[in-house]
Structures are given as structure tokens and as C-alpha cells.
Amino acid sequence: MNLLKHIFLEDDYDAYEGTLDPASFFRINKQEEIIASTVCEIGWEYSKSFGNAYICTSFLCFHSDDFKTRFTFPLAAVRKLERENSDNDTFTFDLSNFHSQIIHLRFKGTRQQSEFFCDRLVRQLHASLEDASSVGLFLLSLASERVCFSESANSQEIESIDLGLGSQFGYPIASSNTNGLINENNSKSWIQYLKKNGANFNLIQTPNFQKLVQSGIPNNLRADIWETCSGSLFPRWKSKGFYAKNIDSVINNRCEYSEEIEKDLTRSLPDYPAYQSPTGINTLRRILLFYSETNKEVGYCQAMNIVLAALLVYCTEEQAYFLFSQLCEFYIPGYYAKIIHGLLLDLTVFEYVLEHTLPHLYQKIIELDMDLKLITINWFFSLFIKDFRLDYAFRILDCLFVNGPRVLFQVALALFKVNAQGILNATDDSSVMKVFRQCFDHINQGTAADEKMAALGSRSSMCTLPQLFAVAFEYFDFITDSFVSAKRKEFKSSVLYSLRCFTKRSHLRSVYQTTLLSNTDLDLVYDAFINAIGENNICHGDVLEQKIDFNGFERLVDCAAPPLSVIREPLHYQRSKRKLFTRLYIWMKDGDSTETSLTFKRIIHGLERLKADIALHSEILCFQLYDLKRDGTLRTEEVVELSESLILLCCYEGDEKDEERLTVISEFLKSCFSGCQDRRSFQITMEDFQAIVDTTGLHATLEFFLKKLIDGLLGKLNAS
């Protein structure tokens, strides 16, 4: 009995199970629509399972009530669907797949639910017929298909399949004294399981499958199992050679991350022979360049090289590309983003979990005034690849791809638990780090070293990988993907807020000392600027030189213009807004019409000028704003545009002053054009403009107008 499960403060953890949306649970494209679902019993090869079935756009999915049995079948891989004759109203079907396996489906919902489910299943099967022709040829490229189901396959055909760099440079080999060694019997067990329960497109995962995974996956099947369980096999099949078609053109283009990637190539698994040779280095370079160029919102981040270098040991470039993409979308979203927000979020979730599952260890870390993230950041960032010897690291990746992101939390918790005594005896942070270093050393040395340490009486260091797995997956089995997902959602806003504050402080640290704006105003304009360009486009170098185009500037300042109480803004209103924003944009660039973008530095400088001169020189600022030719005169169209802008920002406040301002603006226009015979040749100088402003009392309206512009640039109106 797992007592921890019952004293865990979050004792309603069972309520989280099933809260994960089906697309995330089955790791299928978020664009897949869940068309129908029903309660269902499935049977195959003397096995049965009861749970829920789902029809998606391209898949038939199932999970048992305890979530320990599941499958995700592409509808295109279904060969036949036949209804069994039944004396009652039970809906029972036999489904045949490409491996000639028969899956019995018995729908247990209401008659109406079952009829609807069957109707939609037949419809989607018909819709998938176009893809069915490509399934057979694609499956023949998979090692699992050749090993388990191809009658004509021989050793030469199997060896001809590309099994990653390991087929050329060797796979990591477990030492002979290591428990859980992947031997011939293990390979036979895998082949027997796959023949009985299906492989690749037709794999049914059961509790026995989980046990096999923990014992290790054979080298020739590892890439297939990773792809199938992660869901990356399906987008790779549907891509129809996307990687091969585009790799050459993409890597021949200049990549902004080339220098960073080049520096990290030789640091990626430096002890593995492939990355001491041009073949391995070139392979890794190609996929890193391709991924960063085809996922520009992510780009390149350190630790990508380590994870992809590991995947390439067993995978082709194409397999590794889709597998890593799936990893980043469904397992560790945001880990390798520009601000690694996903990594920081998971470290926060782990801190919460440690506090509530092993509170005595968490309290010890607090007493030592130690930042928990210093211990765990490399574990999560590199998926433990840097901490365990390579064959063990792949065993953890096996569990991760099959069971989901909870594995990272379970293994990390297990490391704390098996080292509990050493942590409690620690006197400072360095001694805690030493405890973990020694633990990794002993695990990586294998069983013989562990037995020697146990003989010396060191119980806390006595641990093998199978023992660590037992603690992780049995003692902490209540940590589920649904639980992790729920906690990610719970902490996401606070983590992002803290991250934004930290990023802002680091970006503006030097600017605070030099700007004429107050710290509050600088914070506001920074927030408005970042909202306009989007957080994914932040330049983490010199933020002052970060650029924004006119469309982004329009989003930034649009909040200065009050929304009208109509469904659609009148066309003249939209034109007036765009003209105003164009004037302000060019004025912010100091009239430089050749420059296509505006830097954050120039926005700050423009705001400084506006705020400094608004009270005493509002008429001068407004004149300069519309004197784009910089010849000291305003022409007819410029005076009219100024008047339209004043009406736009000053006469839609919804109070009694709207009418007063409109009257003053009308008087201003009359005074400007009184006595003018030909408006095409009309010009007004700065001095004449100031005189008319004084005569008509327009100064207060100009000042109000500029304040509204400033509020728009600072984002104050959006904030309110």
C-alpha cells in the first residue's frame, strides 16, 4: 500500500485523471476534431478492456477506465469493419487492420449514442480511403513491420533499414553486471508482444507494455516505439517526404542561429563516437538548422543539441525532426522557447510537488537557503541525458515517450527520495549537490558498485536504475499527466508574470538611469511595446534597438483612439485614425521616410519630447507633427488632417466637453481659411498658427489631444 498516496495534501489527485483533453492525451494534432465518443468494450487475442472510444477526423482512439490500456489507430490503416449479428440491440463490430488482427468493438452507450458513433465511424472511414493506399508502403519502411510481420524479411533487408547513427557507430552498451540488461530474451518478449498486440499504426498499449518499456526497448525497435507512442509517426507519414524535399533548400539559406549551433555541435554527447566524426556532426548540424528555420517562433536554444543528438543515435534525421517537434508540442512545451517559460513553469510545478510529497526534504532545502531550481534545472532541461550514462538515459527517454511528461517529475522525486538521508545530513548547498553527484556516479557504475557501497553500510547511495524506476513509477504513481497538466495551468500565469517582470528589469536596467520618463511610464511603454510586437519576437540583446513596423505601431497606439458605440466604425473614422498613426509614426522617426521601422529607443525619445513640452509648447508639437516636409508651413490638407485628428481623439469622450471642443475646432478651421481665395495654394506658418490657436482658445484642446496620444503609447487606456 502506498501510504504517501493517502497523506499527499493534494488528496483529490484522482479527480485530475481524465481531465486532459483527448487530443493531448492521445498526442494527436490539435486540429483533429473529436467527432463522437462512447463507452466501449474492446477485445483481442483473449484480452479485454472497458473504457471510452473516440472518433477523430483521422483516428479511432481508445483508453480504458484506468487509462492503462490505450490505442490510437489511423482510420486509413483499417482494412475492414463488419457488424456482428446479435439477437439484442448491442452494437458489436469486428475491425481488421493491416496486420490482419481482429479487434472486437462492443459499444455500451445508449442506442442513440451507439448509432451516432457508428454512423460517424463509417463516414470517417470513407473519408480516409484516399490515404489508405500509402499506408502499406510506409509501413514497410519501419523496422517493427519488417521484424514482426514481414514473412519475406531476412536479416539483410532488416539491416538495410536506416536505424540512426547507432547502426554505423554502435549503440550504447550496458555493462555485463547491470540489472535490466537488454538481452535476447527481452527482444523475443518484445516481438511476441507486438505480434499479439500490434505494432506501429496498430499498437495497443497495455500494462504489460509498460513493464516491457521499463526493462528497455531493443535497439532495432526503439525508434519505432518512440515514434508510435509519441504520435510523431502519424505526421511523418502524412508529411509525404516534407523533410527530404526541403532540407537542402533550407540549410543553404542563411540562418540567424548558425553561429550558436556551430559552437554547440562538438559539445553534444562528446563521448559518443558519431560526434567525433564529420558524419555525425554534419547530421546534427543539418537537423538543428532545419528545425530552427522551420520553427522560427522557437528558433534555437541550448539543450536542443543534446536532445537531438541523442535521438539521432536511433533515428534518421526525418524521424528525429518529427519526434522532437512532437516532444516540444505535447511533452515539454516552452522548454526551448526564447524565454524557456515552459522549463521554468515545470520547475515551479516540481517545487510544489516536492513540498507536498516530501515536505521534510523540501523544508531542508529551505533551511539551507538553497534555490531548488539550481538542483533540478539541468535534469529537466536535458531530460536527464547529461546526468545518466547514455544507455540509462535512453531508458528514461523510453519511459518519457510512452508515459508522458510525468516521467520527468517521477524520476526527479525518486532521486530526492533515495537520497533523503544524505540531504537531511547536508550542512550547505554544496553538500546537497555532492549527494546527487555521488548518487548519479553510483547508479552509472552499475550493480557491482552498488553492492560494494551497501556492504560498507551506505544505504542512501545504494541504488540501481531498476530500483530508481521502482520508486519513481510505483511510489509516485499518483503523479499523472493530467495532474501535471492541471498544475501547469494553475501556475502558468504567475510564472509568466514573474518572467515578464524579470525580463523587463533586465532589459530596462540601464534605461532607467538615462531616460527622462519616470520608471512607471517606462514600464508602461515597454509593456505596450511588447504587447504590440508579441513576446515571441522580443530581441533579448539590446532592447533599445528592437524594431517595430507600422502595423505593430498601429496596434501599440490604437488604444488612444476611443471606440465608437457602433458595431462598425465609419469609414471616415478609420481613415482619420490611420492618417493620425501615420503622422505620429513618421514624426517618431524624426521625419526619416527612408527608414521602414521604428526602434524602441526612438519611441522613448518621442515620448520624452511629448511629455516635456506638452504644457508650454503643445501648439509647436502639433505643428511639427503635421509639418512632415519640415519647411515650416502647413498646407490645406495638413490643417484638415489635424482638425480630423483633434475631433477623433477629443470629441468622443461622452461628456459635455465634447461639444465645446468641437466648437473650438470649428472656429480654428474658420480662422485658418478666412480670407483664403485659393485653398490649393494655402499655407500657414508657425507664427500664424500660434496666433490662431491663441485667438480661438484651441490650446487646451491641443494639450488634451497630446495627452491622449501619450496615454495610447503608454498603454494606459488598455490597462484601464
Swiss-Prot record:
Could you tell me which residue ranges the GRAM domain spans?
A: 20-85
Q: Which keywords annotate this record?
A: Cytoplasm, GTPase activation, Nucleus
Sorted alphabetically, the Gene Ontology cellular component annotations on this record are: cytosol; nucleus
Tell me where in this chain the Rab-GAP TBC domain is found. Answer: 216-404
* Signal peptide residues on this chain, from the entry's feature table: none
> Which segments cross the bilayer?
none
Query: What are the recorded GO MF terms, alphabetically?
Result: GTPase activator activity
One GO biological process term is:
vesicle-mediated transport
Q: Give its localization.
A: Cytoplasm; Nucleus
Any Pfam family from its record, for instance, is RabGAP-TBC
Spell out the InterPro entries in the cross-references: EF-hand-dom_pair, GRAM, PH-like_dom_sf, Rab-GAP-TBC_dom, Rab-GAP_TBC_sf, Rab_GAP_TBC_domain
Q: What does this chain do? A: Stimulates specifically the GTPase activity of ypt2 and ryh1. Inactivates ryh1 during recycling between the endosome and the Golgi compartments.
Which PANTHER family does the record associate with it?
Answer: RAB GTPASE-ACTIVATING PROTEIN 1-LIKE, TBC1 DOMAIN FAMILY MEMBER 2B
Name it.
GTPase-activating protein gyp2
Q: What organism does the UniProt record list as the source?
A: Schizosaccharomyces pombe (strain 972 / ATCC 24843) (Fission yeast)
